[in-house]
């Protein structure tokens, strides 16, 4: 989702805010495109910044990639919340639970606009915790007699870590 930023940053000279992992990934893209990284600003959940008349509040959410945040944009006419893509996971692998309390606080105060993005949100039911995937890996690694092939997004760092941890547990080799 950050592939366009090197092109935008060539045209617009302004600060670019992101969490450490996001900016780390972006730095590789910038280098590939000959764009400097002096405008990058690291933020973390709980950070607040002011940009002109806007006050931004970064709120922890869960997603397949670690270090994800939503942004509450407090404007003179009301608050806009942009969630980015997120997943509700009450038991995330890294223990960093989504800040439900912050969303509730903003809800109590009133939100002008919620821009929410959650893959498969239109499907009924819920998505199990990423920890459940780890338990499935454990079962597969325990009983598999031959090679195991796992496909995942490269950004799904927690899933990749669970594969590696499970492979170590069962004395298996990992090839990426």
Residue ranges and their predicted role:
Residues 1-176:
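His/Asp/Glu-rich metal-coordinating catalytic cores
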């Amino acid at each position: 989702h950050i592939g366009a930023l090197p092109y935008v940053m060539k045209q617009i000279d302004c600060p670019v805010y992101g969490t450490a992992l996001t900016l780390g990934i972006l730095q590789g893209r910038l280098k590939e495109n000959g764009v400097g990284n002096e405008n990058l600003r690291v933020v973390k959940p709980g950070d607040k910044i002011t940009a002109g008349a806007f006050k931004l509040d970064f709120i922890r959410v869960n997603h397949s990639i670690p270090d994800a945040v939503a942004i509450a944009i407090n404007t003179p006419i009301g608050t806009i919340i942009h969630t980015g893509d997120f997943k509700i996971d009450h038991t995330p692998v890294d223990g960093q639970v989504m800040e439900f309390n912050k969303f509730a606080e903003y809800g109590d105060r009133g939100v002008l606009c919620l821009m929410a993005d959650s893959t498969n949100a239109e499907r009924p039911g819920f998505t199990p915790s990423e920890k459940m995937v780890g338990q499935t890996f454990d079962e597969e690694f325990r009983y598999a007699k031959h090679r195991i092939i796992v496909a995942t997004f490269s950004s799904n760092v927690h899933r990749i870590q669970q594969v590696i941890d499970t492979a170590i547990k069962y004395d298996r080799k990992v090839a990426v």
